[in-house]
Amino acid sequence: MNYTFQYGVVWKNFGELLDGAILTFQLGAVSFAGGALIGLFCAALISYAPFILRLPVHIYVVAVTNTPALIQIYFLYYGLPEFGIRWSSEACLLIGLILNAGAYLTMIMRAGFLSVRRTELEAGQVLGLSVVQQVRYIVVPHIAKSIYPAMANFFIVILVMGTSVGALIGVDELTGQAINLSSVNYRWLEYFTVIALMYVVLTFIASVGLALFGRWAFRVRARIF
């Protein structure tokens, strides 16, 4: 093998890779937060709403979870302009990831709702707790503790695999920056070796942060490692 690694080229452009890493984290965080809101709303509908309201949610979840995220984002980026709707590549990626995360988090949160036993609510009623107090002191802590590890793991999936799809539609997140820079000097191995390590660092930071937050807020350890 006559290939000579030249990481000096990567170091000269490391600032741009760092910008891509920051954008990656921002996209992952916003996508997860938006998806969590959708997931909470849809999980509540599936768990407690009548069939006529549950049906659209079921269709949404089945459609999204049974098609690749890339196809969904391509539809937003390439399909919507055919109908006169044009969004930036960043907007298409963000909306696509939010909708995708919302469907998966709906299933996770629904499992949390189903884990609350009727006897626990009845015990709250016997103690004289109002509906709001039952939700605050019984439902929310129980659900949060049961679903937090799964949600923490899903955030890592969004952060690494979800955001990197944006490189295929021109988003300059971490993978996109590496593709752009390596296409100039053709040092593909160097750039992608470095961003692989950067992804490891990103996920490590996120994992530690989520584990510490889980212990502090819910007294539960997110088993990520």
Name each model feature, range by range:
Residues 1-225:
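Transmembrane alpha-helices and adjacent helix-loop boundaries
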